[in-house]
Amino acid sequence: MFQNSMTPLGYYDEFNCFSDTTFIIAAGAAGEIGYSRTAFWAADDCYYFDCSEMLLSRYLYYIFKSEQQYITSRVRKASIPRLSRETMEKMMISIPPISEQEHIISILDRFDTLCNDLSAGLPAEIEARQKQYEYYRDKLLSFKGAD
C-alpha cells in the first residue's frame, strides 16, 4: 500500500491498482514519482494513472521523471506538502506511437539498470573498463612502425 511516501506503508492482499502502474505521491512526499510492477493498493494520497492503448504506463513514468522539477515546483508547501490533482490533469505530454514508446522505454530501462542496479551495472562497467584497458595496453605495446 502506497500512501504518502515511496516506501510502501504495508502490504495488503487486495489491490485497486494493477501491475505496471505509474503513480505520484500527492501528500507528504508530494511530487515523488513511482512505478509498480506488481498490483498494489493506492491510498487517497497517491494518484495513479490508468493508461489507454495509446499510452504505455512505463513511458508515462519516464515522462513524469523528466518533468520531476516542474512537478515538484507545483507542490504546495504547507505543514503537509500537497500536489493537486488539477496540476497533473493540466500537464501536456507528447504521445508518440506505441512502437516509439517501447523503443524509448527499452533504452531508458537499460540505462536505469546500469546506473542503479549494482549487480547488473557494476559488472557491465567492469567489463567495459577491462576492454578499454586491453585496447590501450595492446596499442601501447604494439610498437608498429618503430623500426
Residue ranges of model-derived segments:
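Charged, alpha-helix-forming regions
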Residues: 1-147
